[in-house]
A protein has these predicted regions:
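Oxyanion/phosphate-interacting regions
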Residues: 2-24, 201-280
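Active-site-adjacent structural elements in enzyme catalytic cores
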Residues: 69, 77, 85-152, 226-229
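N-terminal subdomain of lithium-sensitive/metallo-dependent phosphomonoesterases centered on the IMPase/IPPase/PAP
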Residues: 1-100, 278-280
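Acidic beta-strand-loop-alpha-helix segment within the catalytic core
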Residues: 10, 117-201, 243, 247-280
């Protein structure tokens, strides 16, 4: 490590100031998370049943302060809402922050969490950084610049699905798993690491063939979506509609998405569509 940034990541410099800042902020947040990890305390439960720690609040507040100093006209949308967020997402540039994606792991002193920073322009991801401080894995991407892990270029291989394929699925499902998910469990191998952003980054690496989440938030995916897209992968709503550009009036709504390498994504979409046709 040098100045808190993995040495290999210094081999590739993002081409614009917002992308560089996204990387800086993800690493800054990750350093705070790592310092607080062993003594994580102050756990509370939010009304939606998710965990919140003091580290979530501390990291988000710090990142928002840095953004306000560097880009005062930009909008910030953070999971915990610690800053003076605008009620409407006006403006071209949005900073979408998940201070700790995987808080349920972090708060239990388990690995499987990260800091995610995404930059959207007119509703489309243009830069992102996802940092896992325990593994020291830093995923970065910016529009037209490719996807990177600690300075090495990554690509999502266009591999078809097979019995050896791994996929990630959100839980819980209060109304029970839908038929297409039962089919996936019968044919492929489930992995769940507890962080949507890391799931998407693992798909960009080719480790996961596809990822499905029926109730994600924009901050869960904003930083990692461009990593997957720049790696050659795909992400859409679960019904196949384009996810981006995302409109301001729906940016805070739950998102059901499907993502993965371009081949697996298409095949998984076919499964979802077929199940819906049967239901009709």
């Amino acid at each position: 490590m040098t100045d808190g940034v993995p040495v290999k990541s210094r081999m590739v410099e993002p081409t614009n100031e917002r992308a560089r800042t996204a990387v800086t902020l993800a690493v800054l947040g990750g350093r705070i998370a790592r310092e607080r990890f062993d003594g994580a305390s102050g756990v509370v439960w939010k009304t939606d049943g998710s965990m919140l720690t003091q580290a979530d609040l501390e990291i988000e507040r710090r990142l928002e302060q840095e953004i306000a100093k560097r880009f005062p006209a930009d909008v910030v949308l953070g999971e915990e809402g610690t800053g003076q967020e605008r009620s409407h997402l006006e403006g071209r540039y949005w900073w979408v922050l998940d201070p700790i994606d995987g808080t349920n792991n972090f708060g239990r002193h388990m690995p499987g969490f990260c800091v995610s920073v995404g930059v959207l322009c007119d509703g489309t991801p243009v830069a992102g950084a996802v940092y896992d401080p325990l593994s020291d894995w830093l995923f970065t991407a910016w529009a037209g610049g490719g996807a990177w892990l600690n300075g090495s270029r990554i690509n999502a291989p266009a591999a078809p699905l097979s019995p050896r394929s791994l996929f990630a699925l959100r839980s819980p499902w209060p109304d029970g798993l839908p038929p297409f998910a039962h089919g996936w469990l019968a044919r492929y191998r489930l992995r769940r690491f507890g962080s949507t952003a890391l799931h998407l980054c693992y798909a960009a690496l080719g480790g996961l063939a596809f990822v499905h989440d029926h109730r994600a938030s924009l901050w869960d995916i904003a930083g990692a979506a461009i990593v997957l897209l720049e790696a050659g992968g795909s992400i859409t709503y679960a019904d196949g509609r384009p996810l981006f550009p995302i409109a301001p009036n729906v940016a805070k709504e739950p998102i059901a998405f499907l993502a993965g390498n371009c081949v697996a994504h298409r095949l998984a979409l076919d499964d979802v569509g077929a199940a819906h046709q049967v239901a009709l």
